[in-house]
Amino acid sequence: MNNYFLRKENFFILFCFVFVSIFFVSNVTIIKCNNVENKIDNVGKKIENVGKKIGDMENKNDNVENKNDNVGNKNDNVKNASSDLYKYKLYGDIDEYAYYFLDIDIGKPSQRISLILDTGSSSLSFPCNGCKDCGIHMEKPYNLNYSKTSSILYCNKSNCPYGLKCVGNKCEYLQSYCEGSQIYGFYFSDIVTLPSYNNKNKISFEKLMGCHMHEESLFLHQQATGVLGFSLTKPNGVPTFVDLLFKHTPSLKPIYSICVSEHGGELIIGGYEPDYFLSNQKEKQKMDKSDNNSSNKGNVSIKLKNNDKNDDEENNSKDVIVSNNVEDIVWQAITRKYYYYIKIYGLDLYGTNIMDKKELDMLVDSGSTFTHIPENIYNQINYYLDILCIHDMTNIYEINKRLKLTNESLNKPLVYFEDFKTALKNIIQNENLCIKIVDGVQCWKSLENLPNLYITLSNNYKMIWKPSSYLYKKESFWCKGLEKQVNNKPILGLTFFKNKQVIFDLQQNQIAFIESKCPSNLTSSRPRTFNEYREKENIFLKVSYINLYCLWLLLALTILLSLILYVRKMFYMDYFPLSDQNKSPIQEST
């Protein structure tokens, strides 16, 4: 009975010991984790303070530079054209990012923000500190308290400017998009600075911007932090970025251009870059001997030939004359006041116009990933591309079926049917494999033998649209970058911008498209900044704190289990002696 009582008592003590040990070890773990987190936060604050000091030093240096520049400008009466341009690197692509973005500085001291370049909208906005419904982006939410020049646009019931609504004593920012998503928050003003990589002068001005307090859909998951709209100001509307930019820099021509490649590109403020024009680069290398005996100052016409070996050449044997003279840019009138709409009058495939309308208003929009066209035009293009899409080169039946096609058997006869058949034969011969991904989008292994499209603009000018542009690189394939229009809104998106210099002349209200070799900028080459978003890393192991806590708990349980086994062994030795020890002295004597 006594032995039983002793065992029960000791097991009760053991239970209490185990409970206290677990509680102690767990609290120690939490305290250590919190200490680590606090240390990392302190380091982050120190880095931010250093960033502020650097920003103040930059401001002082900028003032000195501006004074020196003013003195230099007074002495220099002649400027080079290149010095009048401000160039900004664009990052991103069509496949991974679905947009192109640039970095600008907001506030004093500055905080860098990555912004999607969007010619289809007018707002400049990004998430701010305190937003609970915002996604995780490249930079931390903008902190208004860090900037000496930030000012929230407060209101009292109905005294907001520009017809804005007053919500919660702040003027409401609200933006809706065609795919159904919304972002909203409040307006604030601050200094916007554009650091150019080719010009030491910085464009800087005050701008009313939107602070995101709620994000939805695509904005919630995008990597870039915000959006930079480049469209024009509506009557009585909030002044847009592009209008304020040229208003505060009257020395600049009200022209800007966008030049994007497969990866990255460039935004040019104040004009365009003729050195990027493809025709200029071809002239510098070597001109066709038969067509280019005259000097480069004359009109230059390039005959586009068969596309059997090079995707930069035409898809059929018929020569198509396209003017590529640098000094003879073909401009297209902007047909609407506040957005960049132009008229197109035809869309040719193998010499056949597949447009059933005389003209079509299309929005030139760098914020749209793909080019959106009317359903009937899309179906026509898709029909011919489907014939050229062969996913099984060993299927003799399907191949013979395509080879037996006649011009009369097609949905719409082609003017250059023989070139279409030649391209089909070459695709089969070269085994240019084609697969289909989501929504039946065709993807080819190579650009060879795929057709060029031609868009008819004003004055019957036909602009070439190459496969390297309307297709985009997806891993090792080239996929179609065309979609059916939504809400009856045709759009010339990034798959139209690619490999062209798109020039916006705001003074003359016109746009031009010039084939160009646009610069590439990989996102991996993008400079880092103190305010970029970083997941907190454990200083011991690069694992989450939950995993660290579990590791500590497992270690504690292992130690406790060892103690239990040791104590259990001691109990058995004390209260359950060996059989030889259980014999009494009397029994031994007998």
Curated annotation (Swiss-Prot):
A UniProt-annotated Pfam family: Asp
EC number(s) reported in the record: 3.4.23.-
pH-dependence of activity, as noted: Optimum pH is between 5.5 and 7.
Side Cytoplasmic, residues: 566-590
GO cellular component terms given for this protein: endoplasmic reticulum; endoplasmic reticulum membrane; lysosome
Keyword presence, Zinc: no
Segments crossing the lipid bilayer: 545-565
Record's keyword terms, sorted: Aspartyl protease, Coiled coil, Disulfide bond, Endoplasmic reticulum, Hydrolase, Membrane, Protease, Signal, Transmembrane, Transmembrane helix
Protein family membership: Belongs to the peptidase A1 family.
Designated name of the protein: Plasmepsin V
